[in-house]
Regions:
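N-terminal Rossmann-like FAD-binding beta1-loop-alpha1 element of flavoenzymes
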Residues: 2-28
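Conserved Rossmann-like nucleotide-cofactor binding loop
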Residues: 11, 34, 262
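Glycine-rich FAD pyrophosphate-binding loop
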Residues: 20-45
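Mid-domain catalytic core of redox enzymes
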Residues: 22, 230-362
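N-terminal glycine-rich dinucleotide-binding loop that anchors FAD/FMN and/or NAD(P) in oxidoreductases
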Residues: 42-68
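Conserved flavin/dinucleotide-binding core of flavoenzymes
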Residues: 43, 100-101, 317-423
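Mobile amphipathic helical/loop "lid" adjacent to a hydrophobic cofactor/ligand pocket
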Residues: 62-182, 186
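Helical element adjacent to the flavin cofactor pocket in flavoenzyme catalytic cores
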Residues: 186-245
Length: 423
């Protein structure tokens, strides 16, 4: 069959790969200048050497990424273990800590004397014990903010641990995290061993940068990928699908929309009531990622430096401010420390900036979670199929799973989907 795939992020690439290997004639349309979406590795020249630095997709783990890992094995792509430490720095109060060890937890020695700091630690342990009970009911409307306040968790735990941790994971600001569905939040934490102090998955990175998997994944159909080709509209009829690209109408038998949910809705010339209802449930937040070498964005104390570093601000409506230490995450040995900061709330020295990139991340609400459950109502209807990480938690594994689900619906089950969450 002649099938159009719109979008070349992980979902678009995997669906195209599956459909191509099943013998279908595919065309992949990408609005941007490169293939990969959030898989965006930047080549940095420094002192005569080139360093591959990731700026979007960085890590995966051996518990909750079974389909992505299987795909990498099939493609022969190598990976390596990494560290996933987390720090919080509050410029207003001066508080900072790194949760890796007792020594780094008390990197700021004053924390030994702070009763509020011990309250936070106590509530971290308490949350690990009590939060899983939330999974025994089906309340999808309760927000994480309502849950912790209802159960009398301390302000220190909420503001200096839970909201920063969630914000760093989902690239969401404090106000957005407060409205995050509690059950969804806890399920993710449980799946990833984040409610335990010892049983944790092994996190990994793609050797040589995340983009290393793009060539082997897209090589079989590289001549069918069209960059700088934003789709303007999609019109469906009984005989096929008409896609308008660069003011040129092209006909296909089916279309796979691997763009964001809100983008998918805008592209449809004739959305059904179900498509309108489901896709309008997904909203996004635009985050600016800056690749730089300005160490002022890291915690003040060297002992508090972590792989992920959350810098608190005073405006809860502001976007998430988090800095990733790419040398630590990717094992980069360079004379400079490469950092990626999302939405800096401290000015970065202009001479230290290497690249600016804009990403959009799903904003999870009870409406979004409800919309996810209605995928079957719109997928395959009017010759249109939907995939994207937004159908899950918003990560690479979710993108792969959604693509395999679409491929199966089109009779192209090249890689059998696994639902395993290793424990």
């Amino acid at each position: 069959m002649k099938i159009a795939v719109i979008g070349s992020g992980i979902s678009g690439m995997v669906s195209a790969w599956s459909l191509h290997h099943a013998g279908h004639e595919i065309s992949v349309f990408e609005a941007g200048t490169y293939v990969g979406g959030h898989t965006n590795t930047v080549a940095v020249e420094l002192a005569g050497k080139t360093y591959a630095v990731d700026t979007g997709f960085i890590v995966f783990n051996d518990w909750t990424y079974p389909n992505f890992i299987r795909l990498m094995e099939v493609l022969g792509v190598k990976s390596q273990p990494t560290t996933m430490s987390f720090s919080v720095h509050d410029p207003l109060s001066g508080l900072e800590y790194n949760g890796t060890s007792i020594n780094t937890l008390f990197a700021q020695r004053r924390n030994f004397l702070r009763p509020s700091f011990y309250r936070m630690i106590r509530d971290i342990l308490r949350f690990g014990r009590e939060a899983p009970l939330l999974l025994n009911n089906d309340d999808t409307l309760l927000t994480i903010d309502e849950y912790v306040k209802k159960n009398n968790y301390s302000k220190e735990f909420i503001e200096h641990y839970l909201l920063p941790m969630g914000g760093a994971i989902w690239s969401a600001g404090t106000a957005a995290m407060r409205t995050f569905p509690a059950r969804y939040f806890v399920q993710f934490f449980k799946n990833h061993g984040m409610l335990s102090v010892d049983a944790r998955p092994q996190w990994r990175v793609i050797s040589g940068g995340s983009a290393s998997y793009i060539k082997p994944l897209t090589e079989p159909f590289k001549n069918r990928i069209y960059l700088n080709s934003p789709v303007q509209s999609i019109r469906r009829d009984h005989c096929g699908v008409t896609i308008l690209v660069n003011n040129e109408a092209q006909r296909f038998e089916h279309v796979v929309i691997a763009a964001h949910g809100d983008q998918a809705l805008r592209l449809l010339s004739d959305p059904t009531p179900s498509e309108q209802a489901v896709l309008s449930g997904f909203t996004y937040t635009r985050n600016e990622a800056i690749l730089h070498t300005d160490m002022r964005l890291m915690p003040r104390r060297r002992l508090a430096w972590a792989a992920w570093n959350y810098r608190m601000g005073t405006d809860e409506s502001a976007l998430v401010p988090v800095t990733y230490d790419m040398n630590a995450l990717q094992g980069i040995d360079a004379p400079e420390r490469f950092l990626v900061t999302l939405n800096p709330n401290e000015p970065i020295a202009s001479g230290r900036i290497l690249r600016r990139i804009s990403y959009q991340h799903p904003h999870y609400t009870s409406q979004a979670v409800a919309a996810q459950k209605r995928w079957h109502e719109i997928n395959g209807v009017n010759r249109t199929y939907y995939c994207g990480a937004y159908w899950g938690y918003g990560f690479h594994e979710d993108g792969v799973v959604s693509a395999l689900r679409v491929a199966k619906a089109l009779g192209a089950e090249i890689l059998t989907q696994s639902t395993r969450v290793a424990r």
